[in-house]
């Protein structure tokens, strides 16, 4: 595999691969969920879509929302973690997987607006379109999707019931987002990186060639310390505080939703301290939370102890069940 793409490709698929290793599965009596695709937002000629997986019947059911990762630059709603989908099948939950407009053609404020609009659509249309019980919603996501999951707890109204963030981050303006990274492989030339983006607004990278090229763009941003500026359009050093409203760690209040976080201590893509910083602020505000730490695990829990990885994944599913049964 081309090393210029490898890191971001791993960012997008590591969660799915990690969750594929669990022994849980469908039973003989589990009926498959019914999949439909919906446009939840239109901006000009760009349609932003969501895939809905729902159980048969008209009874209102709780909702699990999945937000994909990919550095806010690549990824797709089609990247669905098997284990979470299996949970929804067994428990007869509605499962909702979101696309959103990708950077750098749009910036983080627009991406955040897509997340808000997705939940507005879910509350307004979900009950009649797919029998969603919008009083019970758990939001889940990995890496950049974990960031947007955390952000949803601060910007979505009404607030979700609970959140599950896999190796996410609570800030987008910290030094780690603006520093040159030594962990992203062979240097990607600027001209090559820029040639991969800027042609049109995308809501997913289902085209493998497109995803690969944009992966190179992400690697270039991390190698040069330009990632935060590239995806937000705001220079955090020149305009300190301007990104605060889009940094979940700076928006926690006592009514922030309960959250479970999973993170490896050797994560070289999203530092482990991103989750410990969140945990500290959550504790300060008295918010219920759990941080499951995987010693020695890389991004996506690569190199983590298989038993501990399985235990963490199982606890995440249990947390989802607990939260959706609580109301």
What residue spans do the PLM features occupy?
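Primarily recognizes the serine-hydrolase "nucleophile elbow" in alpha/beta-hydrolase
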Residues: 117-193, 243
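Short amphipathic alpha-helix adjacent to the substrate-entry channel of hydrolases
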Residues: 78-96
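The serine-hydrolase catalytic nucleophile loop
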Residues: 74-84, 109, 273-274
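Short beta-strand element of the alpha/beta-hydrolase
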Residues: 60-70
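Short beta-strand/loop motif that positions the catalytic acidic residue
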Residues: 261-263, 267
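Accessory cap/linker subdomain of secreted extracellular hydrolases
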Residues: 164-250
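Catalytic active-site module of serine/aspartate enzymes centered on a nucleophile-bearing elbow/loop
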Residues: 308-327
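N-terminal cap/lid segment of alpha/beta-hydrolase-fold proteins
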Residues: 28-58, 112
